UniProtKB/Swiss-Prot annotation:
Lineage: Bacteria, Bacillati, Cyanobacteriota, Cyanophyceae, Synechococcales
Organism: Prochlorococcus marinus (strain MIT 9313)
Gene field: surE
GO cellular component terms, A-Z: cytoplasm
Function: Nucleotidase that shows phosphatase activity on nucleoside 5'-monophosphates.
EC number: 3.1.3.5
Gene Ontology molecular function, alphabetical: 3'-nucleotidase activity; 5'-nucleotidase activity; exopolyphosphatase activity; metal ion binding; nucleotide binding
Swiss-Prot/TrEMBL keywords: Cytoplasm, Hydrolase, Metal-binding, Nucleotide-binding
Recorded catalytic activity of this chain's protein: a ribonucleoside 5'-phosphate + H2O = a ribonucleoside + phosphate
Protein residues bound to a divalent metal cation: 11-12, 43, 101
Protein known as: 5'-nucleotidase SurE
Family to which the UniProt record says this protein belongs: Belongs to the SurE nucleotidase family.
Cellular compartment(s): Cytoplasm
SUPFAM superfamilies on file: SurE-like (SSF64167)
Amino acid sequence: MTPLQILISNDDGVLAEGVRCLAAAAASRGHRVTVVCPDHERSATGHGLTIHTPIRAERVDELYGPGVKAWSCSGTPADCVKLALSELLAEKPDLVLSGVNHGPNLGTDVFCSGTVAAAMEGTLEGLPALAVSVACFQWRDFQAAAQLAMDVAENALADHWPNNLLLNLNIPPCHLEQMGSLRWTRLSIRHYEEQFSRRVDPHSRTYFWLAGEVVKDLETAGDGPRDWPSDVAQIETNSPSLTPIQPDLFWRGDLSALPAACVANQPVR
C-alpha cells in the first residue's frame, strides 16, 4: 500500500499506552503519522469543544518512536482533530484514527465517547475515520488491537470507504489466538441505572461522583440488519465488533407517528 498520511488522536491523553501502540503500528507499516492528543485524560467528554479558554499545543515527539510527530493539546479530543486539520498539519491526512481507547465504546455509549468524537470530527471533514477501543478498562495489551485497527483501515481504504462513514471497532480483552472472527455489528441500545455517590468536602459542601451501571442492553433495538449481532453481543463472544456509524441523526421511524401538534396552528409570520 502507498504510504498514508495518518492523523491519530484519543481521549485518554497523549501519554496513554493505547495511542502509543497505535502510532507505532501505523509507523511500522511505513505510514506518515502525526499524533495530536489531549494533554490529560478527557474520557466521556463527547463532542465538546473549548470556546471560553485558549487552546495550547506543544510538540512532544520525544514521547513517541521514530517517524512519529506528536503534539500535546490542552483541548478536548474534538478540539485536537479540529486544530490538527486547520493548523498543525501541513497537508490533509488520508485517514483519521482515534484510540486505542482504554475501555469499551459500545452501543449508545458512543454519544458520550471522546474517542468516537475525535473520529467523527474527521468524518465531518470528509475524511475516512476509525475509532478503536479495547472493551475492558483493566486490559493493557494493546498490540493486537492496534494491528487489527490498521488491518481494518487499510482494507477499507483499498476496497471502498463511503463518504460519511465512521467505523467503530471494539476489541475483546483477550490475546489474538483466543479471539473470534471480526463481524459487522449493530449499535446496541444501552440503559443505565444512574447512581451518584454523595460526598461532603472539608468545607462542608456537597459534591457527587457519577457511578452508573449498565442494567440492560436491548438486543432487538436499533437500526441495522437483523442477522447482524449487536456490538455488545459480539464482544461477549470474545470476538471483535465493527459498527458503521454516520453523523446524520435524523429519525428513521414512521414519519406519520410524529406529533403533528408540534407544528399545527402556528401563527402566520
